[in-house]
C-alpha cells in the first residue's frame, strides 16, 4: 500500500514539472520579454524627447551667483596690481560686503551713490562723541562710506572713470571710499565754533586729498591718484576795521 502511494506521488510531481510555463515566467529573449522591452524602450525614448523639448522651451534658471558675475564689470583685474603696498590707501577698501564700523568704532553710513549723501546728512545727523566734558570741535564733520563712485578728478585735474566693481579671481569686489565732509559750514551763527567773531570771519569747509584708486583707462585697469573729501577745517580771515 505504501509503495503504491509513493508511486502516485512521484507520478504527480513529474506531471507538474512537465507542464508548459506561463508567459510571466518566460526566460529572457522570448517573444513576451521582447515585446515588453520594446515597449519600455519606446516609452523611455518618448520621455527623453519630451524632456528635451521642455528644457528648450523653459531653460533652467541661472544661479544668483552667475547673474551677479554677469552684471559685474567685464574687465578682469590682474591680482599683481594688489601686491604692491605703496598702492594701498587706508581710505580705499575693496570688499564683497558693505564695510563695518570705522577704525575708531564710530558709526558710519553706507551710501549707494553720491546723490544720497545730502539726504543722509539731513536725515541722520550723528555727531562725533565728545571724549572729555567741555571739549568741542571747531567744525562738525560726518564720515561716510561712499559706493558706486564712477567719476573723479585725477592729480592733473582731468576727469577719470572710477571702477565700481572689480573682477578679481572670479570674485566681484566693490570699491569703497571713506570720505569726511563738513556737516554744516556754520556750526554757530557767527561761523566756526570758538572763534572770536568780533575780530575774525570764519566758516567751515571740506578739504580734499589724493588717494590711489583703481580707474579705467581704455579697456585696462590702472592705479591713479584721485581727489576725495577727507576733512572739515575752519577758514578764518581778519575783519577790516572801519575808520
Curated annotation (Swiss-Prot):
This is Venom nerve growth factor 1. Residues 19-125 form a propeptide. It comes from Oxyuranus microlepidotus (Inland taipan). Transmembrane segments: none annotated. Its main location: secreted. It is found in: Secreted. Expressed by the venom gland. One of its GO terms (molecular function) is nerve growth factor receptor binding. GO terms for cellular component: axon; dendrite; extracellular space; synaptic vesicle. Homodimer; non-covalently linked. Belongs to the NGF-beta family.
